[in-house]
Amino acid sequence: MKLKILHFTSGNKLHIDNILKKLKSKLSEFEYQFYISLMEYDENASRTDMKVFYVPNIFVANWIKSNHLESIIDAFEEESNNGVRPEIHIKVKEKKENVKSLKNNKSMLYFNTNGLSLNPFYTFENFVVGKSNEYAYTIAKLVLQQQASAYNPVLLYGKSGLGKTHLLNAIGNDVKEKNKNVLYVTSEDFLNDYMDKIKRKTMDSFRDKYRKCDYLLIDDVQFFGGKEGIQEELLHTFNTLHNSQKQIVMTSDKPPKEIKGLEERLRTRFEWGAMAEITNPELETKIAIIKSKCEVNRIVLENEVIDYIASNIYGNIRQIEGILSTINAHINLSPESSSLKIAKNVLKNYQIEKLEGITLDNIIKVVSKELNIKPSEIVSKERNRKVTFARRAVIYLAHSLMINSMNIIAKELGMKDHSSVSKALKAIKKEIAENSTTRNIIEDMKSKIQQSLDSV
């Protein structure tokens, strides 16, 4: 892929190509293909000390700003010996064109009258990529390039609300433009359709529908567990499509081996191709998601508020839109109030779900594993730097994630009283505020604690 250049001369093109080669040599294939190659350089808007780039959406912009800005600066300086300041802007499409395309292209809204309607807003362009979903995103993109290759079937799995359905729709949105016959259904719809055709004695039409498509996209296949009759029909459908070199993509809230009541023959077929897990998003990804939701919904929040929200939501990212809408409503009703204070009050309503099931033992196990120390050291009287940091991390996480009072935390950790816990909490909060490395370590442990509960 080439870095696109707007308004270039032959000399400038060579200059940009050299910079592109430098970037490609320093970055992974994934980073280059899905981020750097999407940049468009605008020569007319650029100056010697400032270079203007356009990218297709806010997600790419945020990712490049967070991860690759220094690499771009270094590449320009190596090429021209001049200091530069890159400006990353989002390329805006004409609204009339968007409206026209929706009116004139019914497949934008419906890609198969025999299946579910495709959500036109679930695309690869507005899917926020992070460490938690990078592999799943890559596999989904590769399906478009190498249909019926090693990536068949594809199974995307992870708990609800993390983006599996978004990726499934993104695949459908993409391939529908290539005049492929795409069928997207939930497993429950597949079952209901099966039962209806049996009742009507029209199973031939059922088989024609599901076995003659180019892409079969099935959401929530864990629903098939324990349903023997439909599993037999799905097995034959699977075999027919696979033998015909047709692509199958599925989602599940768990890997095949954990789906109770799933026949062994079907389980092995689910595992034939590529399986990709989507886990809870890390802090940077949550921040990018919140910023994108704010932009789409025209919600203006300070970075301090966005950071607070990202640091205090766990698991299901589907909550984010509801949280942002509630915060925005409160801000509009009380414009004189602090946005951060409003955000804190709103998030209290989401704490019950977050707190359920978390124990101090969960937290100590995760912290001790991540920091490579023994759990017994955390509850001991030792005061060396490593143990002190681990103990403070446990206190901070317990205070953030649990209902327990300071006195209970002090007792469990063998500390004198709540004042000792308060002092340790104040110290770790200060370190988190001043040290981004500490903050990232703590946030990573928060995610691991949530994941440890999800796996139970």
UniProtKB/Swiss-Prot annotation:
Annotated stretches, region: Domain IV, binds dsDNA: 332-456
- For whether the record's keyword set contains Secreted, the answer is no
Q: Enumerate the residue ranges of region (Domain I, interacts with DnaA modulators).
A: 1-83
- Quote the subcellular location field of this record: Cytoplasm
Enumerate the Gene Ontology biological process terms.
Answer: DNA replication initiation; regulation of DNA replication
Does the entry feature the keyword DNA-binding, yes or no? yes
An example Gene Ontology molecular-function term: ATP binding
Q: Where does ATP bind?
A: G161, G163, K164, T165
Record keywords: ATP-binding, Cytoplasm, DNA replication, DNA-binding, Lipid-binding, Nucleotide-binding
Q: What does this protein do?
A: Plays an essential role in the initiation and regulation of chromosomal replication. ATP-DnaA binds to the origin of replication (oriC) to initiate formation of the DNA replication initiation complex once per cell cycle. Binds the DnaA box (a 9 base pair repeat at the origin) and separates the double-stranded (ds)DNA. Forms a right-handed helical filament on oriC DNA; dsDNA binds to the exterior of the filament while single-stranded (ss)DNA is stabiized in the filament's interior.
Q: What is known of its domains?
A: Domain I is involved in oligomerization and binding regulators, domain II is flexibile and of varying length in different bacteria, domain III forms the AAA+ region, while domain IV binds dsDNA.
Query: What HAMAP family does the entry give?
Result: DnaA_bact
Descriptive protein name? Chromosomal replication initiator protein DnaA
**From which organism does this entry originate?**
Helicobacter hepaticus (strain ATCC 51449 / 3B1)
Point out the gene that encodes the protein.
Answer: dnaA
